[in-house]
């Protein structure tokens, strides 16, 4: 299997980094993990909703090989100032400690910690070099990195895990329990299970996956990611953590009021929803706003799925846009730069829908765009965004994404 042009460029960076930093990857393997683009329900995973999304072609590449010792030695081409992250298996910093707060090394540390805690015997260290081109927020860079390292350490140690949802759980535990980031399972699921050319539907009730191609006759469209040039420091330091806590608080309040629910997604009946708003809207207006977004987005989700299967990308785009308005106005999870991007592209004919992506505050927005309108959208962004957000005039980026496999392994290239 050959690398794409972008993959070869990444490999060139990896090979130079390996040479400059004394990392031996000769004869090893390359694992590529994707980013993800969620079509619904954004912020639904920790609220119990069904999910739908695709893997997208912004990646993290890891070139690695077993080194015959109990040491892990890793270098990131994206964070060269951190130098080589090196540690012995079984000897990593404590979870959430000050020692890990400012280094990307918290991810491999956390993976070693969680795998050991869960009973996996890691005896074989690796040498590896990483490089990625996933934007700094909105496309699940941390989940992609975590999955890549878990799979690579399993491979080096001859560990096979048949149940892929277990790998999702391990990746989530690294962020939840070690790093302190309160992420759900959306990102890991949408990346690990992603298939080229397919939408991935996830049902949390039985953790089943269904692959859905877009229906025949769909208009030719592109997934566009609008990287604002801002970089979110991490979910644990973001509005995401506050919103998740608010949703959990509302569930607790409703349970004490004898509502038979375990998560906000359990509120599907409009009569029950209206009763809750009437009962708690005055005493807990912010919490009811969060419910308003989840309730309406969940109802729209089923219409979006049917539209996707029917090839009606126009309706998919309309729902994507309305979800964005709900995320901005009711969930209040967006950010000024994210909304600037949305405001710019919304005015361009051929844009079917646009909204913020991912955890919120910073990072990237996304749009569904008719193929013939992509260049006009790019010109609009290039003209208006630097003028509106001069601090990020040299940092923003415009990505036209393909739907790809979430994980690929390359051999014989090193």
Regions found by a protein language model. Give the residues of each.
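Glycine- and acidic-rich phosphate- and metal-coordinating loops
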Residues: 112-135
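Alpha/beta catalytic cores of group-transfer enzymes, especially the acyltransferase/condensing modules
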Residues: 159-209, 355-356, 413
